[in-house]
Amino acid sequence: MIQREEIPLLLTGFMATLSGVGLARFAYTALMPQMVHAGWFSGEQVAYLGAANLLGYLIGALAAAPLAERMGALRVLVVCWVAVMLSFAACSFPQPMALFFVWRLISGIAGAALMVLGPSVAMSAAAPQRRATLGPLMFC
């Protein structure tokens, strides 16, 4: 049973994962055929946009811990949530390929950092005897 004081921890880990995977990574994957159909980009260009996001994921996963040490994990989480939101909004209208590439790269960096830091921050704040119960629920 989840205790009332654990709900913020559970939501932090869950929302970081949802934002990092759902919005930052996969939200635009489903829209890529429509972007081609609408004439925003060619099929080859959307492949590069996907690569930009994956490159961002690599950078973000490697940079998450050093950034958290330097800036504090909570601050990094907030900055990354804002970056995902801005990237999501910026990619909602046609713009030059290079700019879209940068936004997808930013989305990947921020998304990976959210996935790495969110659950670990939440779990470190949880009581040790409750971690085995709370951890799996963050990834439902």
How should each PLM-predicted stretch be described?
Residues 5-30:
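Pair of pore-lining "gating" transmembrane helices in MFS-fold secondary transporters
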Residues 26, 53-62:
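Residue-level signature of mid-helix packing/kink "hotspots" within the transmembrane helices
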Residues 30-40:
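Membrane-interface helix caps of multi-pass secondary transporters
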Residues 40, 72, 93-99:
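Helix-breaking motifs and short loop linkers at transmembrane-helix boundaries and internal kinks
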Residues 60-72:
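Helix-to-loop junctions at the C-terminal end of transmembrane segments
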Residues 75-89:
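Structural signature of the two symmetry-related core transmembrane helices
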Residues 83, 87, 98-107:
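Paired small-residue
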Residues 103-140:
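Cytoplasmic helix-loop-helix junction between adjacent transmembrane helices
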